[in-house]
Structure formats: structure tokens, C-alpha cells
């Protein structure tokens, strides 16, 4: 899904295009002045938080907790000229609920080069750490990579996907970089951002959402306090999670546990409409309904939540066009 920086104006209107042009010009002037007077935009770091907030509001369906936590955490961190530690967020939830999408938006709206920026680093266990027997080698390589890149630029973003599939103990080498005590040669590493993504805790989050629905509570009434303890405990109990028996959890180096709720049918519909718009296609109702009807839902009795969230929406649309 493409990202429009600076303004996120209404689509398809002359007024929207005018707003985009004016917003871009104003943002350029302000950003140029801001970068000229300080180190705010060092290393390709060019944050557009209003654009991020707008994009999340428009395109991230059913995730009031994730939206609020991500935006609040980033605003406080980016606006602090001397943060005491790096920003560390751990994203949890069922498959297809928006975790990877949010992480890609962070790269797009924080760095001019987006995911292609040399200061955005994405790690996948399947690609980078495929053999558990090589864990010690991976530890040395990961520590060297993180330290080397932080030495080059303290304003770096590190994304760790599929934390459920990492070799045990690997993440422990990151602990010195996540707190306030580590010194990296010549740069302020405390300006770095670390994002960890996993499905662990998804079942616990789903259960909270299901109980809220059964109690006829509004979904937006679900609070972080209802889900965070269960998610944290699920991480501690999962020997396959990268934070299992980790000092990162014990020393409370995570700034926020960000829960992603399971998606209902109307949320999947929102994803279908977004994808059709992205493809430049009219929202044909027969295509929308075909995608929704072909999606599987759970629990078996209520048929309430999408089994794959919005993950398979794009491929299903292609099939039904």
C-alpha cells in the first residue's frame, strides 16, 4: 500500500490536491528551517507525524489501541531533543491485523527513503537467522551490525519480524542498546527506534475481544490494561519467543506493548475497499461480497473474527475480479 507523505488530503478532489501542494510546500519550508538549525533531520530522518496519524486513521481498521499507543509514543519520542533511551515497541496480535503494515508506515513517515533508507534495518528470522545451531554466530553478527549502524547514525530504525521464530537467547545481545547506559562511539544511540513484531499474545487478545463482544461492550471500550498483562505473560511463557527468559523483559526495557485486536467482517470490508482504491478500481459490491464470503471466521459458533485478518485480501481480490 503506497504512502502519501505530508498531509494525507482527501482523495480525488481538486481541493485535496491543492491542500497536498500547500502542505508539502509548508512542510518543506518548516523542515528545511528545522534541519538547518539543528540535528533534527540527521541521517535521512524526516518525520511526518501528522501524515502518519492521518494514514493510520484512514487505513488501519479496528485498531484503536495500536493507533493511540504508536502515535503517542512516537510524538513524545521525536519531540524530545535528548531522549533518555531508545524507543522500544513490541507489536502483538493475530495474523493479518496490521502489525507489519504499521511498521512499514513508521519507516515511510520517519525517513525520506522509507524502507529503502540506509538507516532502516529489517530482520527476518527465516532470512537472517535460519539455523538455531548457529545462534552464537548470529549473536556476534547482530551485535556488530547494530553497533556499527548506530555508530554511523544514532537515528536508526530496527525492525525485528516474527519474534516467535527467533533462536532462543539471540535478542539478549540487544539489551545494552535498549537502555540508557550503552555508549556507541560518537553518536547518540538513544535516538534509535526498535520495533519487535510477533503473533504471541494473539490468542489472549482475541479472548478479551470475544468476551467484550459477548458482554455487548463497544470494541473501543477495550483498554490496554485489559490486554497488556496477558500479552506480557504469554511472551514470558513462550519458549519460542525471542524475549523468553530475557533481561529485556525483566528489566522492563519495552516502552509499550502494542496489542492488535482481531478483525471482524466490517473491518475486512474496509481493507477490501482500501485495496480496490489502491488498485484504482471501482468498489464493485459483488467483488467485495465475494471476498468477505470466501474469508473464514472464528470462533466456530459466533463466526466473528477473520482467521487471517486482512492478510489474504489482495490475493482474493485478484481471484474475484
Curated annotation (Swiss-Prot):
From the Swiss-Prot or TrEMBL record, state where the protein is found.
Endoplasmic reticulum lumen
Keywords assigned: ATP-binding, Endoplasmic reticulum, Glycoprotein, Nucleotide-binding, Signal
Q: Which residues bind ATP?
A: 93-100
Q: Which species does the entry assign this protein to?
A: Rattus norvegicus (Rat)
What is the protein's given name? Torsin-2A
| Biological process per Gene Ontology, one example term | positive regulation of calcium ion transmembrane transport
Q: Which InterPro entries match?
A: ClpA/B, P-loop_NTPase, TOR1A_C, Torsin, Torsin_1/2
Query: What's the chief localization of this chain?
Result: endoplasmic reticulum
- Give the record's family classification: Belongs to the ClpA/ClpB family. Torsin subfamily.
**One MF term in GO for this entry?**
identical protein binding
Signal peptide limits: 1-27
Q: Per its UniProt record, what SUPFAM superfamilies does this chain match?
A: P-loop containing nucleoside triphosphate hydrolases (SSF52540)
The reply to whether Nucleotide-binding figures as a keyword in the UniProt entry is yes
Instruction: List the glycosylation sites.
Output: 149
Q: Which domain of life is it from?
A: Eukaryota
Disulfide bond entries: none
Pfam families listed in its UniProt record: TOR1A_C, Torsin
What is annotated about its quaternary structure and interactions? Answer: Homohexamer. Interacts with TOR1AIP1.
